[in-house]
């Protein structure tokens, strides 16, 4: 899980979601794409 100022979808499998008020990118195909806005 990378923490970034700006999160973007990196492939077509990435999903933008909101958990506990934080914007996150979760990817089912490639877990390296997981990001959290910090």
UniProtKB/Swiss-Prot annotation:
It comes from the Bacteria. One of its GO terms (cellular component) is cytoplasm. Keywords: Ribonucleoprotein, Ribosomal protein. The keyword Ribonucleoprotein applies. It holds the Pfam family Ribosomal_L36. GO terms for molecular function: structural constituent of ribosome. The keyword Ribonucleoprotein applies. One of its GO terms (biological process) is translation. Belongs to the bacterial ribosomal protein bL36 family. This is Large ribosomal subunit protein bL36. It comes from Kosmotoga olearia (strain ATCC BAA-1733 / DSM 21960 / TBF 19.5.1).
